[in-house]
From Swiss-Prot:
PANTHER family documented for this protein: TRYPTASE-RELATED
Location within or outside the cell: Membrane
Coiled-coil residue windows: none
Topology in the lipid bilayer: Single-pass membrane protein
EC number of the protein: 3.4.21.-
Annotated protein name in UniProt: Serine protease 46
Domain Peptidase S1, residue spans: 44-281
Enzyme class at the top of the EC tree: hydrolase
Family per record: Belongs to the peptidase S1 family.
Length: 314
């Protein structure tokens, strides 16, 4: 670990371990123009050395100036989050976004204005289609602390048992005692089979309902008795492959924070790749020249959104 810090739970011991995914990505160009890249440095915060730049796509979403949810940068203009985070109001003027935030509360960065809210048209409760995007009034400028995350293509799925990371500022619960972290952090989790997840949540089934966890969801569990809690809504579930981070999920819901027998549930981003693409339809999508030895199958790895000549690796 960097910065000489100690990790008693061993959660951060292997942040660069690649995820096992069904296809491989390809990307060229410098990291500053790429997605899913990090530039980790050390900084003294409140007298303690902490890592900064580890999760540069992470943003905080505010309602009337108060933090309510997390989100992730997928483009100069666009933020990905959970639909249930935006139920307080459909008026974009009431929401703002902060990028490059390392600790909460934060008074060092400016609030960015939101001009448009797009909630999935099928979202009617917190259980399914829990995805939304926000459009910023002005494009953000990339820096070592502000970078976009990659999105998966439709057929990109993490294998069962893959270790991924949940990123956010929300509540964490260990050994029955909740605590509030103020620095953005990652929690190591493993992908759980949806059928097992369904079995754990079968008591929630309604009459004539055959399953609760749909194809638009992913489930994870933690081996350390830690888990995501209510204040992590909208946070990113990211997996790393070939040193590139890909957002595979958006924190949606769970049953009672920290209960290991109940997996955390996420919106599967790969399920909504085409939906996101349709919402950002005013952009021009172009392809990238690639080495001849790469097959088209390899190009189905992830999406990189760039404002000029937007690139979708599909």
């Amino acid at each position: 670990m960097a910065c000489g810090s100690v990790d008693p739970h061993g959660l951060l011991s292997s942040p660069l371990a690649s995820a096992r995914l069904n296809s491989l990505p390809y990307m060229e160009g410098p990291w500053i123009w790429s997605c899913g890249q990090t530039n980790i440095t050390c900084k003294v915060v409140n007298g303690k050395a902490v890592e900064v730049g580890k999760w540069p796509w992470q943003v905080s979403i505010l309602f009337l100036g108060m933090y309510i949810c997390s989100g992730s940068l997928i483009h100069h203009h666009w933020i990905l989050t959970a639909a249930h985070c935006l139920q307080r109001s459909k008026n974009p003027a009431k929401y703002t976004v902060k990028v490059g935030v390392q600790t909460l509360p934060d008074n060092s960065t400016s609030e960015l204005l939101v001009t448009r809210i797009v909630i999935h048209e099928n979202f009617i409760n917190r259980m399914s289609d829990d995805i939304a995007i926000l459009k910023l009034k002005y494009p953000v400028t990339w820096s070592p602390l502000v970078q976009p995350i990659c999105l998966p293509s439709f057929n990109l799925k993490p294998s069962i048992g893959t270790m991924c990371w949940v990123v956010g500022w929300g509540l964490e619960k260990a050994e029955g005692h909740p605590k509030t972290p103020y620095s953005v952090q990652g929690l190591a989790v493993r992908i759980v089979n949806n059928e097992i997840c369904n079995h754990r949540y079968q008591f929630l089934l309604l009459k004539n309902q055959k399953k609760f966890i749909g194809n638009d969801m992913l489930c994870t569990s933690s081996e350390w008795g830690l888990d995501t809690c209510q204040d992590t809504s909208g946070s990113s579930l990211v997996c790393q492959m070939n040193k590139t981070w890909v957002q595979m999920g958006v924190v949606s819901w769970n049953f009672d924070c920290g209960r290991r027998q109940f997996p955390s549930v996420y919106t599967s981003t790969s399920h909504f790749t085409q939906w996101i693409k349709r919402q950002i339809g005013d952009l021009k999508f172009t392809s990238m020249a690639v080495p001849s030895f790469l097959s088209p199958f390899i190009l189905t790895g992830y999406i990189l959104l760039v404002s000029l000549g937007s690139l979708w690796l599909l």
